[in-house]
Amino acid sequence: MNIRPLHDRVIVERQEVESKSAGGIVLTGSAAEKSTRGVVLAVGKGRILENGTVQELDVKVGDTVIFAEGYGTKSEKIDGKEVLIMSENDIMAIVE
């Protein structure tokens, strides 16, 4: 994949979530929950502050993150893979 996000944007590949209920029923369609976990594939250079300096991002390529899929999150298909483009502000945690 050859994509470079700008500024504080991050490219995330969503991780698959278990598609079975606790009772073993396979969930499909709207009953299947979308995961809010993913792996960071690419990061921008950083957030531009008011004084013009660039603040490096906290997340790095390869980090597993938990994110909020909000208004600014964009879903794109790149090289046959569905990825999410979001601001670092939409990332709530890094899973360690």
From Swiss-Prot:
Record flagged with keyword Chaperone: yes
Highest taxon in the source lineage: Bacteria
Keywords tagged on the record: Chaperone, Cytoplasm
Molecular function terms from GO: ATP binding; metal ion binding; protein folding chaperone; protein-folding chaperone binding; unfolded protein binding
Cross-referenced SMART domains: Cpn10
GO cellular component terms, semicolon-separated: cytoplasm
Localization: Cytoplasm
GO biological process, one term: chaperone cofactor-dependent protein refolding
PANTHER family: 10 KDA HEAT SHOCK PROTEIN, CO-CHAPERONIN GROES
General function of this protein: Together with the chaperonin GroEL, plays an essential role in assisting protein folding. The GroEL-GroES system forms a nano-cage that allows encapsulation of the non-native substrate proteins and provides a physical environment optimized to promote and accelerate protein folding. GroES binds to the apical surface of the GroEL ring, thereby capping the opening of the GroEL channel.
Complex and partners: Heptamer of 7 subunits arranged in a ring. Interacts with the chaperonin GroEL.
NCBIfam families reported in the protein's UniProt record: PRK00364.1-1 (NF001526), PRK00364.1-2 (NF001527), PRK00364.2-2 (NF001531)
Alphabetical list of HAMAP family matching this protein: CH10
Family: Belongs to the GroES chaperonin family.
Listed name of the protein: Co-chaperonin GroES
Gene source species: Photobacterium profundum (strain SS9)
Source organism phylogeny: Bacteria, Pseudomonadati, Pseudomonadota, Gammaproteobacteria, Vibrionales
The encoding gene: groES
